[in-house]
Each structure stands twice: as structure tokens, then as C-alpha cells.
């Protein structure tokens, strides 16, 4: 049986040109919902077989919410969405792994659930506290099977609400090489109430909205409005870079995720690099080698992704784990700047491939990072 799909663009095109620059109306970027059961079944089978989700757990402060939210996330991915899942858990020092306790330290184990979904648990260790998410996601890539065609990296505290999420994700990855798998994101409070709404970076970019951060020394987190003072249609704070990102496998075969952000901001760097503006995602006084790593990733992305960066329709829910003011998204840059963090000499990779801090070289940097992680107060239920 063959299917004919109506063009989704007003000039008769059925796909987006990679050199397309003028903004498109939001409605033209909305993927249609197909109701043919054979189509849905075929796309769902493709998602089940060819799409893998990778997440990571690193919890040196031993926050309880990290584990409870992960278990909720795992149930959502494997039981509700019925997608394959790779979890990379990094334990600190000689502590036991909390989620993959049945494995040897240097081993990975494949589990096949009753519904046919596969999960892979990977155990690694480190002895210093740095931001590891992108680093652990890259380690998870080593475990994906050869027939995997699409990879979704996701924080272990989100919930995808679209009823046909996997189908829509794969459809979007036919059009774009990289996507943020949501249009809007809702931050939830401790009682499940919505306390904030965001629009994804991919959504804003795909709809022609220009990211224009104010010149400052705070990492490019403040965005100016355009000349007409209008933002993307709808509501929500624009250009959110976080929560999740999905790639075609062919992209990840040529480039992996950027690991330079030892206090976070890796997602921010990568989203801005995908649109060729990574210089504006970091303070101007950042160490030259930090800037060099980001620019190198941007150059590689320009060659491989070539601006093909979009989004998936739908909303994700972001579970509460402490007030966002404690993340200090802007002021944490002071730790990096004051200690002149150099990614070429201040960190190394251990035998597991996990980033370690050269702790004795810069003890002030070591102590400041430890203080930062403790000050996040992720088990607190205070919203403000």
C-alpha cells in the first residue's frame, strides 16, 4: 500500500530546503496526525526497533529525588512509550551504584522486558565532582546496536505527553538531522502545578525567530526581542536549550556531544553552535581553550548538520527537583572564570572514559564545584 502526503509548505515543497531562511508560520511546521492504522503500526515498529533513548545518572550529593524521578522516567520510556533505554550510572568514589547494583563495575548488562523493550545498564565510576551529563551520554552511545537509526538523549526527569511521541520524533528526523523533541516545556512544582513554560530552541529556530542575546558577561542567557518586538506565536519563554535532544545515527557516527561544560551549559553551547552562534553562549573572558573546544564543535556541526535543526510537536513535563534559583545558571560562570578553568589541563578521562578533575592542581576550583552541587538543594520542595 502506498501513501501520498500533501505538501506542507505554501510553495508546493514537501520538504524543507536547507538554505531556507525566511520565517514560516507556526502552522506550517505542525506535523499532521496520520490516522491510518497501518501507517501508525509501521512507524511505531520502526521506533521500537530503531530508536534508542539514552539517559544518565550522576549523584555525588545523594539527592533522593534523582533516583525517584529516574524510576518514574524509566517506567515512562519503557512501559508507556515502549522504547529501548540505555542508562549510564556514575557512582562517586567507592559508593555502590544505586540503580544497577547487580552489575560488575566495568560491565554493561542487557535486559529484555516482557513487552520486548530492551534496556542496557552501564556502570562507571569517578572520584571528582564535575557536570557529567554529556560525557555520560557519549559513553552510552557505545552501547547502541548497529541497527539503531535514531538516538534520543533525555534528562531523567521529563515526561513526553504527545500520544504518538515516537512516531512524531521519527517523522521529524526525516526532515531535520537534529531536533529538540518538544515544542513547549512545562516546569512542574512539587505538587504537579505548572510554574513555568518554555519554547524549545529548535522550535524558535525552525520558525525563523532570531536568537539575539544581549552583550554581557553572563553566558548569553538573556535574549532581546526582535525589531517588531514580537516573539514566537503562542506563549512561553523562548529558546530553551535543555531537557532532551535527538539525532540521526549518521550524525553521531561523525560527531559526539560537547563535553566541555563541567558546570553545565553544554546544551546551551550545542544549540547555539547548531545555528552558528556559539561565541555568544559563553562569557567573553572565558579561557581560550574553553572557547576553542566550543568553536571546534560548532565547525564540525556546520559540516555535518548544516543548520538542519528543528523540533517535534508536543509538550514535555519537567518534574520538580528544587527551586531553579539554586541552579545559578548565570552566577555559576563565576566559578569557571575566577579559577580560569582550562579543559585541556584541568580535567582528564579515567579508564571508564569519565571526566575527572585534576583536584590537586586547583583546589579552589574543586571546592567551589562541590559547594555548587550541594547548594542546588534538589530535595527541597520550596518553589522560590
Predicted regions, residues:
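Conserved catalytic core of nucleotide-sugar-dependent glycosyltransferases
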Residues: 159-277, 292, 297
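A conserved acidic beta->alpha catalytic loop
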Residues: 57-62, 69-81, 88-108, 158
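Short aromatic-enriched loop/helix-cap "lid" or pocket-rim segments at secondary-structure transitions
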Residues: 97-101, 165-166, 190-195, 322-324, ...
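Short beta-strand-to-loop acidic/aromatic patch adjacent to the donor-nucleotide binding site
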Residues: 148-161
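Short glycine/serine/threonine-enriched helix-capping/active-site loop
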Residues: 88, 179-184, 312, 319
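Active-site-proximal specificity loops/subdomain of glycosyltransferases
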Residues: 89-148
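Short loop->beta transition adjacent to catalytic acidic/histidine clusters or analogous donor-positioning motifs
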Residues: 48-52, 75-88, 117-118, 149
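C-terminal catalytic/acceptor-binding lobe
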Residues: 2-49, 59-69, 73, 261-384
Amino acid at each position: 500500500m502506498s501513501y501520498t502526503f500533501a505538501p506542507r509548505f505554501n510553495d508546493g515543497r514537501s520538504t524543507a530546503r536547507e538554505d531556507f531562511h525566511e520565517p514560516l508560520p507556526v502552522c506550517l511546521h505542525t506535523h499532521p496526525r496520520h490516522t491510518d492504522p497501518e501507517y501508525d503500526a509501521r512507524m511505531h515498529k520502526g521506533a521500537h526497533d530503531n530508536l534508542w533513548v539514552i539517559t544518565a545518572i550522576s549523584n555525588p550529593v545523594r539527592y533522593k529525588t534523582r533516583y525517584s524521578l529516574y524510576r518514574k522516567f524509566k517506567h515512562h520510556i519503557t512501559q508507556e512509550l515502549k522504547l529501548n533505554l540505555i542508562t549510564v550510572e556514575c557512582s562517586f568514589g567507592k559508593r555502590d551504584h544505586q540503580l544497577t547494583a547487580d552489575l560488575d563495575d566495568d560491565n554493561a548488562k542487557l535486559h529484555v522486558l516482557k513487552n520486548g523493550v530492551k534496556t542496557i545498564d552501564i556502570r562507571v565510576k569517578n572520584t571528582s565532582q564535575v557536570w557529567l551529563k554529556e560525557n555520560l551520554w557519549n559513553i552510552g552511545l557505545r552501547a547502541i546496536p548497529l541497527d539503531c537509526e535514531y538516538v534520543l538523549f533525555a534528562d531523567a526527569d521529563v515526561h513526553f505527553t504527545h500520544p504518538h511521541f515516537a512516531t512524531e520524533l521519527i517523522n521529524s528526523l526525516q526532515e531535520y538531522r537534529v531536533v529538540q523533541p518538544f515544542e513547549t516545556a512545562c516546569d512542574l512544582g512539587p505538587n504537579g502545578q505548572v510554574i513555568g513554560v518554555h519554547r524549545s530552541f529548535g522550535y524558535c529556530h525552525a520558525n525563523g525567530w532570531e536568537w539575539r542575546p544581549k552583550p554581557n558577561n553572563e553566558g548569553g542567557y538573556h535574549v532581546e526581542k526582535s525589531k517588531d518586538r514580537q516573539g514566537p506565536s503562542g506563549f512561553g519563554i523562548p529558546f530553551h536549550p535543555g531537557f532532551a535532544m535527538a539525532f540521526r545515527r549518521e550524525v553521531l557516527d561523525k560527531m559526539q556531544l560537547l563535553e566541555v561544560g563541567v558546570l553545565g551549559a553544554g546544551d546551551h553551547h550545542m544549540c547555539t553552535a547548531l545555528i552558528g552562534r556559539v561565541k555568544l553562549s559563553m562569557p567573553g573572558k572565558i579561557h581560550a581553550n574553553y572557547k576553542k573546544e566550543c568553536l571546534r564543535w560548532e565547525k564540525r556541526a556546520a559540516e555535518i548538520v548544516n543548520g538542519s535543526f528543528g523540533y517535534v510537536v508536543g509538550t514535555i513535563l519537567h518534574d520538580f527537583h528544587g527551586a531553579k534559583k539554586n541552579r545559578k545558571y548565570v552566577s555559576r560562570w563565576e566559578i569557571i572564570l575566577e579559577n580560569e578553568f582550562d579543559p585541556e589541563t584541568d580535567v582528564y578521562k579515567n579508564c571508564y572514559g569519565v571526566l575527572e578533575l585534576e583536584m590537586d592542581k586547583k583546589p579552589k576550583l574543586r571546592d567551589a564545584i562541590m559547594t555548587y552541587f550541594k547548594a542546588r538543594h534538589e530535595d527541597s520542595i520550596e518553589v522560590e
